[in-house]
Amino acid sequence: MLDKIIIKGAREHNLKNIDVEIPKNKFVVITGVSGSGKSSLAFDTIYSEGQRRYVESLSAYARQFIGQMKKPEVDSIEGLSPAISIEQKTTNKNPRSTVGTVTEIYDYMRLLFAHIGTAHCPVCGTVVDRKSVEEIVENIIEKFEDREKMIILSPVVREKKGTHKNLFLNLVKKGFVRARVNGEILYLEDEIDLDKNKKHNIEVVIDRLILKKGDNEFISRLTQSIETGMEVSEGKIIININGIDYNYSENYACPNHEDISIPELTPRLFSFNAPYGACPECKGIGQKLEVDENKLILDKTLSIEDGGIYVPGASSRKGWTWDMFLSMCKEFDIDYTIPVEDIPQEQMNIILHGTDKKFRFDFESKDFSFHGMREFKGIVKNMEKRYYETFSDSAKEEIENRFMIEKECKICHGKRLKEEVLAVTINDKNIIDLCLMSVKDCLEFFNNLVLTQQQEKIAKEILKEIRERLNFMINVGLDYLSLFRPTKTLSGGESQRIRLATQIGSGLTGVLYVLDEPSIGLHQRDNDKLLLTLNRLRDLGNTLIVVEHDEDTMNQADYIFDLGPGAGEFGGNVVAYGTPEEVKQNKNSLTGKYLRGETKIEVPKERRKSDKFIELIGAKGNNLKNITVKIPLGILTVITGVSGSGKSTLINQTLFPILFNELNKGKLYPLEYKSINGLENIEKVIDIDQTPIGRTPRSNPATYTKIFDEIRDIFAQTKDAKVKGFSKGRFSFNVKGGRCEACQGAGIVKIEMNFLPDVYVECDVCRGKRYNKETLEVFYKGKTISDVLNMSIDEAYEFFSTIPSLEKKIKVLKDVGLGYIKLGQPATTLSGGEAQRIKLAAELSKSSKGKTVYILDEPTTGLHFEDVKKLMEVLQRLVDKGNSVIIIEHNLDVIKTADYIIDIGPEGGDKGGNIVAFGTPEEIAKSRKSYTGKYLKKYLKK
């Protein structure tokens, strides 16, 4: 068996026909500048071929469901193991998916609660236990003294009004003699007169016995009596000894509330993804989509007539719906010509929520007329009706995005399960209480769990699995997460590390794992734990190929491959390979230069100072501890702290929505805070995030940055275009005219295959050029519009060097490290980091007046040391123009270049949410409380 993966002639994307030998059962890092071909080698060649071979071994029937990966451009790969990819792009957006479900910890917890959980009445909290007849008999004999007198009662009425005459008659017919009515034993043959307006309790006397231990005849009679009593009362029995009632049931039934019964405790009962246990109101999601009345108010400064309020079905301001709305306004004296903010609250309530009072409505049109009384249910109800009655997915989606908000379910209060399921506990905690704890606290609970000998025997293996999986999560730096956290809210790095923890839990050996920057989103303190985990995965007998830029990860690796030397067309070669020490000594390796300290990102000679601040007072969203924070303006501020400390809560979920609403007239929902000062010092806020720049292949860097508008202008002004009478619109691939109609300007055509995946092939009419023949006959400097779209940013910069306005915009894309991507590269093929840098470039190319706050969350994602250096130069330029830049970041090369740092923590989750330290990097490095300071101290000395 080969001890290497031997790759020959890899040509995928920009790879230059390279041959690579990767040692097996080792921790291998592939590094290089952005666009050098790292992902092309690791994911698009090695993993893709491993996956393709596995799928190809399946039957044609199975392949139609699984799909198939295309064969990568490579001559041969030998020694390939079964491959598993752990990327950041595959975050689960399913609202039902939680950290607990994807790690399978919740499945084991369901098993645990089903076997050793204690059920309670959800109304009064009384413990409800279920016992078989044999167990009840055993319990009575063990629990009570010999020769004790007992009465066996069967409860038939519990706290119900009525005379119950028919019940008494039926009991006599069945042969029963006595009953206990409201605590008093009466003969059923006697006249029992009950007040029909009062609540009563009635139990049938089944038998009266004297306890005789070891007497088989007594045990037989007791067993028969209990069975009879349970038949009468559907599984419930009361044993009265010395005037005290002892309740037993073969069902989970409350003795105080006979209408409350808990189903049999099975694992599926504790699943919020199954109807047995899920809250019936929210169907187990914990949230409900509701129309947000604030979103229906479009502009408070406008009148209703001028569009200040959205009236469903009346966007054209004419017709039945609009006329009826105006009739309602006239009936209730609502002035629809004044600004919405001046309408009295009582009248606003009628507009939003309607009224029962009917009004006269007369309507005339060509088609029909109406004269009569109508009722107005309010625009909120009308919008809900439109949402639930439409069959159009796009209409539904528009209403969701524009007018609805997710709110906590009012029945389960966001806990997803039925109340009777939440009443089942272990050590006074229900299953959701445990899921709401941090992983660290949850492990502590299970480590300190006190169980009976019988429970210990049942739960031993289940607890072992739960504890191991929780430990794996802690080892990859996710101790601050809760098991209840929806996976759709996780960052790419978090979701990747969860899958990593799950893989370690699986205990597989002989597997090839391909990972994409697992250190993303991790504080330097947690990185050590991650590296131990990766080494453990390797030591199980697996091969790890990790695409990574983190210095510590490279130093820990067994082997490094450095790709480059540049990006795009200038990359795709193996520049250096070997142990970390060998790569450090390689003169050709840019990575080696940074690792040995020959090249580095310099610490600024002086830090900017600021006398203006935004002061956010009383922030207490998520884990923030009612903090007040002053963020300086006009400088570069970095927000630091361990994973889960509250950085994103403070900046992305509190500060940004406040600024966006106040400055950009937005309608976002910030988390709880008291007040904010200093807004007079800024004019607008821009969040440069990692969401895609477009959802379709038609969006690309050229269209997003508006570069393509100028390029189309240039082509429209050429001699060829003027002769043919072509305007700027002719050079758009999104509209009819100049585009190829066979592929509608996409350049590719999708072919659906039955037993194979959908195949995207080059359009055979335009040959992938997007435009028709006539449009491609127009040339600028010997190039068609299609040729220009296929240029890399670096090539386009040289090509348009004589046009200052265009050269300036393209240079910004170059400066943020995107010289390797193509102008027309589809948005769907860009990573989150690339999308973020395109947005940054778009902002930089705009004329700036200063006084803008830019917010970036981990902009170094996917960046090599050299790319980080370029990025920081660009961000410093933004600040030099009089703007404020706020960055959430773990990268110490970025942190050391900041003017000011705000460190949040000290830990993640509940133990975070405080300001640990603030000041210049030098001041933070002196802080004894700050984990960031501890690691920063070393970097400032470099």
Language-model region placement:
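Conserved phosphate-binding elements of NTP-dependent enzyme cores
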Residues: 1-942
